[in-house]
Design a protein with these regions (language model features):
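Active-site-proximal alpha/beta segments of enzymes that process anionic O-linked groups
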Residues: 1-8, 13-27, 35-40, 47-162
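Structural motif
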Residues: 37-39, 166, 213
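Secondary-structure boundary elements
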Residues: 115-120, 159-165, 201-212
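Active-site regions of oxyanion-processing enzymes, predominantly non-cytosolic
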Residues: 152-181
Length: 213
């Protein structure tokens, strides 16, 4: 879907078609023009339980990003398995990550596809996280940060600089606390609130800094 929106050929190993419910409104808004700048905010583990427990936060996300397309999680739903599938378009059987492990992916990814198309990519993630590790060794810019607030700060600076076509920003506080205390524990939901607030700030920065695109 990301490749289709941006006019980039999909990864060689991709098995999943682009999501038409996402492409249709993009075509209606842009016609044949591709998306020229894209921010992907990737907070770990936010799903239906979060939305049910804090509908106010889900509404805050919808106010900024109103299009929602329900999807099933990859099985098994471990972070590296999910992100490997998301950014390759391939199943775990194809990309090779089937448990909680962080090898560098050997197959083609969205990031490879973007760089082949001459697009500049940045991944901003908490140091040693799955997203920080499994996509290494590619011709893109990696920023390994101390924790979520530093990720947000760096992502905001990259958006303002306007030199990257695709910026990925990964947060993990909700996932960290959820595994320790449960998905609807107040501390976990406080982490979710922090993710939503960061997303709102990043979306506002994108609207301002990338308006000419």
């Amino acid at each position: 879907t990301l490749c289709a929106l941006c006019g980039v050929p999909m990864p060689f190993d991709g098995e999943s078609p682009a999501l038409e419910p996402v492409l249709a409104p993009a075509r209606a808004a842009l016609g044949a023009e591709p998306v020229r700048r894209c921010l992907v905010f990737a907070p770990d583990a936010l799903g239906d339980q979060f939305a049910a427990a804090r509908p106010d936060l889900a509404a805050a996300v919808a106010a900024v990003a109103p299009l929602a397309v329900p999807l099933h999680s990859i099985d098994p739903p471990w972070t590296p398995v999910c992100f490997a599938s998301m950014f390759t378009g391939a199943s775990p059987a194809r990309h090779g990550i089937r448990k909680y492990e962080k090898p560098v992916l050997a197959i083609d990814t969205v990031f490879d596809a973007f760089t082949r198309a001459g697009r500049r990519v940045a991944i901003v993630a908490v140091a040693d996280s799955s997203l920080d590790r499994i996509f290494r060794g590619r011709a893109l810019d990696y920023y390994s940060e101390k924790y979520d607030p530093w990720v947000t700060e760096k992502a905001l600076s990259l958006v303002a600089a306007d030199r990257h076509d695709l910026v990925i920003a990964y947060h993990q506080e909700y996932d960290d606390v959820m595994h320790a205390l449960g998905p609807v524990h107040p501390r976990a939901l406080r982490g979710a609130r922090n993710h939503v607030e960061a997303f709102v700030d990043l979306a506002a920065a994108v609207e301002s800094a990338w308006a000419r695109h």
